[in-house]
Regions:
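Polar-ligand-bearing catalytic/cofactor-coordination segments
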Residues: 1-94, 104-208
Length: 208
């Protein structure tokens, strides 16, 4: 990633964005001020994980499929809706501009129904980026403390109920992320790293 940008803001956030020559990691100035150097390295490792693992591309593909699925479901159901309620709506064809509010309503409904799958996919990417950060830094303590700081700063609830997680959480709950930071250390147990092929040791060989 050729560029790292700082952004003035009030919350704590960092993200990777861009494709090709526009790719960059963005760190809000608040996260630079509030986290220790070790914690910032973990955050950078997390964002590097998103980039190295191609999460932006996967998200673009998944988002496109999600859009197509929503449009396909509208195509399947719109005819029945018009036959059933068209007289009340004042139009009988989707080609009528007056049908636009109905299309928006139907797409919003299908998006809501499909959101648990989309959010689960997002949480998986975030979890794997956390794993990447731990494997590249080997720093369990700073990883956990970074999420503790995020929890305190955002006044977040670290362990929400399963229903909230299912329908609202694009990231794993902070409590789960802290637990993972504390408990994931295959390098101390002689186990292979899942993403060791992306790292090099002092001799230039991939880490195992």
């Amino acid at each position: 990633v050729p560029f790292v940008y700082g952004v003035q803001a009030y919350g704590l956030n960092a993200y990777v964005t861009g494709i090709g020559g526009t790719k960059r990691i963005v760190l809000w100035d608040t996260i630079i001020k509030k986290l220790t150097p070790g914690e910032l390295l973990v955050v950078m490792g997390h964002e590097m994980g998103h980039y190295v693992l191609g999460h932006i591309w996967y998200s673009l593909i998944y988002g496109s499929l999600f859009l197509l699925l929503g449009l396909w479901l509208i195509h399947l159901t719109a005819g029945w809706v018009l036959r059933r309620f068209g007289g009340r709506f004042g139009f009988t064809e989707l080609g009528d501009i007056a049908s636009l509010p109905l299309l928006i309503l139907m797409f919003s409904l299908f998006s809501f129904i499909m959101s648990p799958a989309a959010l689960a996919y997002s949480r998986h990417h975030e979890h794997e980026a956390d794993r990447f950060a731990l494997e590249i830094t080997h720093d369990n303590h700073d990883c956990a403390m970074a999420f503790v700081t995020l929890t305190e700063n955002d006044l977040g609830y670290p362990r929400p109920g399963w229903l909230y997680k299912l329908w609202r959480s694009s990231h794993p709950p902070l409590g789960e992320r802290i637990d993972f930071c504390n408990n994931y250390h295959p390098w101390t147990e002689g186990k292979p790293l899942k993403y060791g092929k992306y790292f090099q040791n002092d001799s230039g060989d991939p880490q195992q």
